[in-house]
Amino acid sequence: MTVIVLSGPIGAGKSSLTSLLAEHLGTQAFYEGVDNNPILPLYYKDMAHYTFLLNTYLLNHRLAQINQAIRDHNSVSDRSIYEDALFFKMNVDSGIADPTEFKIYDSLLENMMEQAPGNPSKKPDLLIYIHVSLDTMLHRIQKRGRKFEQLSTDPSLKDYYARLLSYYEPWYEKYNASPKMMIDGDKYDFVANEDARRKVINAIDQKLIDIGNLN
């Protein structure tokens, strides 16, 4: 069984790389389902009010994906359950979200992860982090065109996105739940450039070989 999860900020290319990897490896792809998330547009309008509700909704969604991934044995997911708390913690540190709500969420996350079936299967076999600069992040957010994410809708989102990036590097450095690797999303445009795509896929294949999950 090989379970791969993608991580990275908004606009990093997680869903695109998930599709490419799932096709390459012949595995099931699982997506965050942003377009079907009824809370996300509300969150962007009022983060203080909706942070707890959004993260609880996402936690339930991720655990359902984990259960399905275990049943399917091989899968690639475009968002890691381990990084959801990063968004919540950032909002607490910024004074947007309530610290008590974060403690409740963190306890809920821990308890629900304990109930996930199959002790080894709680953790992925590989986490792939896509690193991007703020310029690349903003360009891709603008390109995909979700209205509630756009700076033209809310210019203050630029500061929010910049803060989010500043939280990701320390989070990735501390992450130790599974083997991990970093992809440079600025250097390798794996969506538009075939050569970059091939290099990224080859690097992931080699990592899977190194950790014993690909022959």
Curated annotation (Swiss-Prot):
CDD domains: dNK. One of its GO terms (cellular component) is cytoplasm. It catalyses: 2'-deoxyadenosine + ATP = dAMP + ADP + H(+). Its EC number is 2.7.1.76. The keyword Transmembrane does not apply. Keywords: ATP-binding, Kinase, Nucleotide-binding, Transferase. GO terms for molecular function: ATP binding; deoxyadenosine kinase activity. Substrate binds at residues 32, 44, 55, 79, 84, 149. The keyword Transferase applies. ATP binds at residues 8-16. Heterodimer of a deoxyadenosine (DAK) and a deoxyguanosine kinase (DGK). DGK/DAK plays an essential role in generating the deoxyribonucleotide precursors, dGTP and dATP, for DNA metabolism. PANTHER family: DEOXYADENOSINE KINASE (PTHR10513:SF35), DEOXYNUCLEOSIDE KINASE (PTHR10513). Belongs to the DCK/DGK family. This is Deoxyadenosine kinase. It comes from Lactobacillus johnsonii (strain CNCM I-12250 / La1 / NCC 533). The lineage of its organism: Bacteria, Bacillati, Bacillota, Bacilli, Lactobacillales.
